[in-house]
Amino acid sequence: MSDVITIGIAGGTGNGKTTITRRILDEFGGDVSVLYHDNYYKRHDDIPFPERKKLNYDHPNAFDTPLLVQHLDALRAGQTIECPTYDYTVHNRAAETITVTPAKVIVVEGILIFAEPELRERLDIKLFVDTDADVRILRRIVRDVRDRGRDLESIVTQYLTTVKPMHEMFVEPSKRYADIIIPEGGHNQVALDFVMERIRAYVKERD
């Protein structure tokens, strides 16, 4: 499927990446497949739950990126894949998988996807969502309490010990690889409209 377009959406935690992914889904509907880097956290069956809670999940080594690259290549070749899923309540990969079918537009979303050369080189359009750190941590707190069963103390501890340092070490430097930087994430309507127009043009070029 040489006409496939692969879009990478990166940036710090809680910065609005998913809002932009939804906008692309709304625009292209069934012609979009999405791969979330978060689903490719490594399996830790041999580590007790209390110890899994202490792992650094914001370092590139936390992810099974080679599997994501393999799955991305398969989708680009027109093959269906079984994507892993991750259970945040137990800090481990879940037994269930998600069937992802090939599509004209493939979106890869994650905080560290631009920090991985083998993944980065497969992306036709690279978008980096840039949002103020205070806004990002507030969004993360709301999300983790509401959707992931976390308590406030554990969220703040994780943010200060791993999330913030890893953002400064890996996420922020990877911004230089972006084709387009979107300030204020999904709330920047002007930037979103510009990005969507660019994607439409790219799709048209491949038709």
Which residues fall in each region the model found?
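Conserved nucleotide-sensing/catalytic segment adjacent to the nucleotide-binding pocket
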Residues: 33-34, 42, 46-90
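NTP-dependent small-molecule kinase module
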Residues: 101-102, 142-145, 164-207
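Hydrophobic positions on the alpha1 helix immediately C-terminal to the Walker A/P-loop
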Residues: 20
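Conserved lysine of the Walker
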Residues: 17
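ATP-dependent NMP and nucleoside kinases share a basic, alpha-helical "lid"
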Residues: 94-148
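Phosphate-binding/switch loop-helix module in NTP-utilizing enzymes
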Residues: 71-108, 113-114, 200
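Post-Walker A helix-loop "phosphate-sensing" segment adjacent to the P-loop in P-loop NTPases
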Residues: 26-34
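The conserved Walker
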Residues: 13
